[in-house]
Amino acid sequence: MLEFSSQDCVFMQRALDLAAKGQYTTTPNPSVGCVLVKNGEIVGEGFHFKAGQPHAERVALAQAGENAKGATAYVTLEPCAHYGRTPPCALGLIEAGVVKVIAAMQDPNPQVAGKGLKMLSDAGIESTVNLLNDQAEKINKGFLKRMRQGMPFVQLKLAMSLDGRTAMASGESKWITGPDARSDVQKMRAKSSALLSTSTTVIADDPSLNVRWDEFPENLKTEYKKEWLRQPVRVILDSQHRIQPTHKLFLTHSPVWLVSSEPRDLTGFPDFCEQIIFPKENLLKELMRELGKRQINTLWVEAGANLSGSLIDAKLVDELIIYIAPKLLGDNARGLCQLPNLTKLADAPLWQLNELEQIGDDIKLTYTPKGV
């Protein structure tokens, strides 16, 4: 087993903190941070900000200048070895005279997948991997799932009362949770490559399903400038072609993909609206594969009980995020999700609680499927 020093951990943690700064802007690329250290001092550091812009290693090398020669590089993901929008980072480290590279994890991207480490090794540079691997995985869980399985990382968001209700019997649901929880939802949307909902939700609430910087938590506004705002793709299941160009969805100039089993005439819709056509059978799984092909890393789901239950039933939910408000709505109010195929308690899906956080008066619970 490889042994790393406490100093190695400190510098890699700094690289991870830098990588996290790119979580709102890098999609479809991974979020990566890099720290260059010489004689125990940081001589250069940086993170990848946006696709097409310099990678983290290049930013750190530019800051270090001549001091990069003889330095150790701490990078949160294996340096790339291929020519894309930017030159290979492994080559940049070699040319700068870096003598050692420590990577938090190997890159599963088939274009990299060990090739970066091999390029470094072939050049005589000592390279090791798997320092603070779990933290590195968490930062890029969407990118990593897409690389490994060809599908996005699916986060299902639900908001409910203490008695597990999401809306009154009439459908009234604004607002179950408080302003702080809704602000947190804006933050989660901002991290996502795409949002998934249904025409039923759109018709009932006429939501914009966009990211609103003014509603961000105050601490996020200081690190994520308004001019950097990136709107996620809105993916809407619309089997009966009920979505119309007058919906608020289309007031935000960001792609809208309408999903159904039959084509429709999009006359009158803005040019950023398009259709995705699938047969009804296995529509959700086929949609996930298609979203993976379209480089969607993380999919944030805001929908009603039907789609929520269908995603859970199909085992497509990677993370279940529940906001619980300190309210009681009674047994006539609407339930959390529909699971019509579930008839035995022994068959109920089990979930592992990973995080519990108080947000204002509400509680945020984050679960992952147990045993997966």
Curated annotation (Swiss-Prot):
Annotated EC: 3.5.4.26, 1.1.1.193
Region: Deaminase, residue numbers: 1-150
GO biological processes: riboflavin biosynthetic process
Domain CMP/dCMP-type deaminase: 6-128
Note accompanying the cofactor annotation: Binds 1 zinc ion.
Pathway: Cofactor biosynthesis; riboflavin biosynthesis; 5-amino-6-(D-ribitylamino)uracil from GTP: step 2/4; Cofactor biosynthesis; riboflavin biosynthesis; 5-amino-6-(D-ribitylamino)uracil from GTP: step 3/4
Catalytic activity: 2,5-diamino-6-hydroxy-4-(5-phosphoribosylamino)-pyrimidine + H2O + H(+) = 5-amino-6-(5-phospho-D-ribosylamino)uracil + NH4(+); 5-amino-6-(5-phospho-D-ribitylamino)uracil + NADP(+) = 5-amino-6-(5-phospho-D-ribosylamino)uracil + NADPH + H(+)
Catalytic machinery residues: 57
Cofactor: Zn(2+)
Residue positions binding NADP(+): 159, 166-169, 175, 201, 205, 239, 304-310
Region (Reductase): 151-372
SUPFAM superfamilies associated with the record: Cytidine deaminase-like, Dihydrofolate reductase-like
Residues that coordinate or bind Zn(2+): 55, 80, 89
Binding site for substrate: 173, 189, 209, 212, 302
Pfam family, one: RibD_C
PROSITE patterns: CYT_DCMP_DEAMINASES_1, CYT_DCMP_DEAMINASES_2
Gene Ontology molecular functions: 5-amino-6-(5-phosphoribosylamino)uracil reductase activity; diaminohydroxyphosphoribosylaminopyrimidine deaminase activity; NADP binding; zinc ion binding
Family: In the N-terminal section; belongs to the cytidine and deoxycytidylate deaminase family.
Protein name: Riboflavin biosynthesis protein RibD
Species of provenance: Haemophilus influenzae (strain ATCC 51907 / DSM 11121 / KW20 / Rd)
Phylogenetic classification of the source organism: Bacteria, Pseudomonadati, Pseudomonadota, Gammaproteobacteria, Pasteurellales
